[in-house]
């Protein structure tokens, strides 16, 4: 492998990195992946909206379809959903590999390899460590698809603790669960997750994923949830853990996601829904935009990568910003207020509106309407001021 063998090097072989490579129409592309197999380890609940599945190119790996959600606060519950399919549950190992196979028709892969950027006089180069061997490449473009804790973004000075927060996730796969396979279970209880929520996601055939996102030791919090929450205890009373996974989640907004000849995609760019933590929908859209902009650059139709920032911000930037504002309010609410919101919502006409117009991928807009419509005695001047 020579210094100038590739026009584009993508650091990270997850779905977004692979979609970026797939959408580069010209040039030689190398995808560098630190793990020895695509899709391992599991770092996602695998719940993807209908629109998200389309953005991902309708990959293989569906194990269940869901029609809605049971949303629980500490003492209240509301059921959202109707007869229509709202989302799909994926076996991520199968899905990720299917997307990677598509990318492999256009791109080369280097597995069990670690790539990092280094500054040189012409921009940035890539230094790769692969099976003890060090390789230096000088591509025209580098893509940082290296996830929530992106080293690429930090080295560029684009990512820091002020423009994003890193949360931890913990998840079990369990069998022998007694669950309604048509609905996801969401738990808004500060006892178990102070900064996000807890979930039970049915995979079909008595399998579930049980997880939470928060700061600190998520494992102990998840064990506590399973042992103490009355709904979880009933669903999981005969269940056994068959798999354990952890991950990281970036919540924030980057004003700039490129520098010189490097750009960031996916979790590295904070292309994540602030209210649910889902990163595949915005990530896939951003990856496609990145691939198209890189193609223009390689064709010398544009002089720099600024168009990438412009296009993703126009496409979904406002949804991330609004989601962060709603999340700021959400973090101020204790269990008593969450109970009040869920109880009021369960008795309101908004359920019909949500079932008809609700969009998993545009959560901020829906949340704003719901909170403004509910009279819960909080003086929602707070919400007005935030938005």
From Swiss-Prot:
Signal peptide: none annotated. It comes from the Archaea. One of its GO terms (molecular function) is FAD binding. InterPro entries: FAD-bd (IPR002938), FAD/NAD-bd_sf (IPR036188), Geranylgeranyl_Rdtase_fam (IPR011777), Geranylgeranyl_reductase (IPR050407). Gene3D superfamilies: D-Amino Acid Oxidase, subunit A, domain 2, FAD/NAD(P)-binding domain. SUPFAM superfamilies: FAD/NAD(P)-binding domain. Belongs to the geranylgeranyl reductase family. ChlP subfamily. This is Uncharacterized protein MJ1520. It comes from Methanocaldococcus jannaschii (strain ATCC 43067 / DSM 2661 / JAL-1 / JCM 10045 / NBRC 100440). The lineage of its organism: Archaea, Methanobacteriati, Methanobacteriota, Methanomada group, Methanococci.
């Amino acid at each position: 492998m020579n210094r100038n063998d590739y026009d584009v090097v993508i650091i990270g072989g997850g779905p977004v990195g692979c979609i970026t490579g797939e959408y580069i129409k010209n040039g030689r592309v190398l995808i560098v992946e630190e793990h020895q197999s695509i899709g391992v380890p599991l770092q996602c609940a695998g719940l993807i909206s209908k629109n998200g599945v389309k953005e991902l190119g309708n990959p293989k790996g569906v194990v269940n379809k869901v029609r809605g959600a049971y949303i629980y606060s500490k003492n209240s519950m509301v059921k959202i959903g109707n007869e229509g399919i709202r989302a799909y549950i994926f076996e991520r190992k199968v899905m990720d590999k299917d997307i990677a196979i598509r990318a492999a028709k256009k791109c080369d892969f280097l597995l069990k390899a670690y790539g990092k950027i280094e500054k040189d006089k012409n921009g940035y180069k890539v230094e790769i460590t692969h099976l003890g061997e060090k390789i230096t490449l000088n591509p025209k473009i580098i893509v940082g698809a290296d996830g929530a804790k992106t080293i690429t973004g930090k080295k560029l000075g684009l990512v820091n603790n002020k423009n994003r927060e890193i949360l931890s996730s913990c998840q079990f796969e369990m069998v022998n669960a007694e669950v309604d396979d048509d609905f996801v279970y969401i738990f808004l209880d500060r006892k178990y997750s102070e900064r996000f929520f807890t979930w039970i996601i049915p995979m079909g055939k008595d399998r579930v994923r049980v997880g939470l996102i928060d700061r600190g030791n998520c494992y102990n919090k998840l064990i506590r949830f399973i042992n103490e929450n009355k709904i979880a205890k009933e669903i999981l009373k005969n269940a056994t853990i068959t798999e354990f996974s952890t991950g990281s989640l970036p919540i924030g907004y980057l004003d700039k996601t490129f520098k010189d000849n490097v750009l960031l995609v996916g979790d590295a760019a904070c292309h994540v829904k602030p209210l649910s933590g889902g990163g595949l929908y915005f990530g896939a859209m951003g990856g496609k935009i990145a691939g198209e902009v890189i193609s223009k650059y390689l064709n010398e139709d544009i002089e720099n990568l600024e168009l990438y920032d412009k296009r993703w911000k126009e496409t979904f930037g406002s949804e991330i910003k609004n989601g962060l504002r709603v999340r700021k309010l959400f973090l101020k609410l204790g269990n008593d207020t969450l109970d009040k919101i869920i109880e009021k919502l369960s008795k309101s006409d908004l359920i019909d509106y949500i079932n008809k117009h609700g969009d998993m991928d545009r959560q901020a807009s829906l949340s704003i309407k719901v909170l403004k419509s509910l009279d819960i005695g909080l003086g929602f001047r707070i919400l007005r001021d935030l938005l």
